Amino acid sequence: MHIMEGYLPMEWAIVWYIISAIVVGYGILNLNKVLKNNPEAKPLLAISGAFMFVLSSLKLPSVSGSCSHPTGNGLGAILFGPAITSVLATIVLLFQALVLAHGGISTLGANIFSMGIMGPFVGYLVFKALRGKLNITWVVMLTAIFADWATYLTTSIQLALAFPVPDFMSSFTEFGTIFAITQIPLAIAEGLITALLWDYLSELRPELFEKITNIKKGGNNE
């Protein structure tokens, strides 16, 4: 999903930078409020960011100018919402671009928009829609799966907008189909891993999980 350095036309790189900057700025404000009201949430923030970093660093070759990997953005979306998750993703993506040559600076805005904004936003919507209807473990798994798929759907749209050859729909279908080969199984695996981590953390700090998410231990997240 990480679009590599210099791959996008400059006009599109600027567009994604502007949109992402607005959301990340809002996320920083929310993050400050969370840390002020719940300073004990810092370990969960760190775990959410580290989880995203580790999973999104496991890249596989994919379409030209990009790659495939898990995203790890579902956990943060559940715990802190999509705005704060965009801040975590910005830190992760910037570090990967500077240190691992994974992604790029010119394409950072586009990568933040897909992995840090749209993926978590869709995941959060799935979480809200299923909350109270299914067991929390299933809800977490499905949230992570759809957050991953939404990330790659967004990247497919971004690449198709930048390179609409012969037209947008044909380009989108081509990019999306190639991504689907790896992302369908990867997202399912990511969902399972995220659910296992959720169960472990909720057992470890049930009182903190209940305070942050209003989900009672052992309940159906009602």
From Swiss-Prot:
PANTHER family: COBALT TRANSPORT PROTEIN CBIM, PTHR43627
UniProt-listed InterPro entries: CbiM, CbiM/NikMN
Organism: Methanococcus voltae (strain ATCC BAA-1334 / A3)
Membrane-topology descriptor: Multi-pass membrane protein
Subunit description: Forms an energy-coupling factor (ECF) transporter complex composed of an ATP-binding protein (A component, CbiO), a transmembrane protein (T component, CbiQ) and 2 possible substrate-capture proteins (S components, CbiM and CbiN) of unknown stoichimetry.
Record flagged with keyword Transmembrane: yes
Pathway given in the UniProt record: Cofactor biosynthesis; adenosylcobalamin biosynthesis
Major place of residence: membrane
Name assigned to this protein: Putative cobalt transport protein CbiM
Lineage: Archaea, Methanobacteriati, Methanobacteriota, Methanomada group, Methanococci
rRNA processing keyword on record: no
Taxonomic superkingdom: Archaea
One Gene Ontology CC term in the entry: ATP-binding cassette (ABC) transporter complex
Subcellular location: Cell membrane
Family: Belongs to the CbiM family.
GO molecular function: cobalt ion transmembrane transporter activity
Listed GO biological process terms: cobalamin biosynthetic process
Function: Part of the energy-coupling factor (ECF) transporter complex CbiMNOQ involved in cobalt import.
Transmembrane segments: 8-28, 43-63, 75-95, 107-127, 134-154, 178-198
Residues making up the signal peptide according to the UniProt record: none
Keywords: Cell membrane, Cobalamin biosynthesis, Cobalt, Cobalt transport, Ion transport, Membrane, Transmembrane, Transmembrane helix, Transport
